[in-house]
Each structure stands twice: as C-alpha cells, then as structure tokens.
C-alpha cells in the first residue's frame, strides 16, 4: 500500500517514490489500494497538475485503475492514527493482507508496525526490497 504522498511524489518529483512506481510498472511489485485511496490519489494529483501542467497524470491514474489490486475495506473501521484520514491506508493493508505500507507521513510512520503490517519510508523500502 502506498500512501498518497508517496504515489503523487513518484509522479511529480522522482526519487525513491518514483523508483517504487517504476518497479510496479515493471511488475516487480503490486500496489494494493481501495477505492477511497484511489479517489485521494486522483484529487491530490489533480491539484498538483495545475502547478505542474507539463506532467500528464492520466496515464498513471489509468494504469493504477486497471492494474492496481483493489481491496474492499467496507465494514473495517480501524481508528488508530492521529490523523483519521490515514486510517484508510491501515484498513487497506489489513484487509489486503499486505506486509508493508510505504509512507512519508509522520502519523503513519509513528505506528511503525500494526497487525503484521510494517510501515516504511520510501527510501527504506527501496533499500530493503528493490536493491539487488
């Protein structure tokens, strides 16, 4: 599961978030998300596209819509994050039986680990899982 900051940073700014998206595009990893997460990805990417009009977000949004692994989180109500908006990432990871959430969000990173789900910064994820 990628939090919105990581997904959008991968599109607009490069660095480890971009490496993660490229690995996903090469099918080296799977991105798990919920409809609620996709809506947030789209909203934040749309906002940034006004600031960076040279970047076309539609191809990656279409790819994630088609090739992302969607998980139904309906009925789950995990309230653990300081910022309740971040709970959707925990819910998605738990429902999807994911091992990792990749996040730069301080509220999520404070948790470190929840119900078998590790929370890693993008650089740590790249170093631990994408380096050969």
PLM regions: where:
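PIN/NYN-family metal-dependent endoribonuclease catalytic core
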Residues: 2, 14-46
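A secondary-structure boundary/capping signal
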Residues: 3-4, 33-34, 104-105, 121-122
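Membrane interface segments of multi-pass transport proteins and intramembrane proteases
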Residues: 50-51
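Active-site neighborhoods of divalent-metal-dependent phosphate/nucleic-acid chemistry enzymes
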Residues: 66-100, 106
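Acidic, PIN/NYN-like endoribonuclease modules and their adjacent C-terminal/linker elements
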Residues: 96, 106-132
């Amino acid at each position: 599961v990628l939090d919105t900051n990581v997904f959008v940073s991968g599109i607009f700014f490069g660095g480890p978030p971009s490496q993660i998206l490229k690995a996903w595009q090469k099918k080296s990893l799977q991105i798990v998300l919920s409809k609620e997460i996709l809506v947030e990805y789209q909203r934040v990417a749309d906002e940034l596209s006004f600031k960076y009009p040279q970047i076309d977000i539609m191809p990656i949004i279409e790819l994630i819509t088609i090739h992302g692994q969607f998980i139904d989180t309906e009925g789950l109500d995990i309230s653990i994050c300081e910022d309740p908006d971040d709970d959707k990432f925990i819910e998605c990871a738990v429902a999807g039986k994911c091992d990792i959430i990749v996040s730069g969000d301080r509220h999520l990173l404070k948790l470190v680990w929840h119900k078998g789900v590790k929370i890693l910064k993008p650089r740590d994820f790249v170093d631990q899982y994408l380096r050969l």
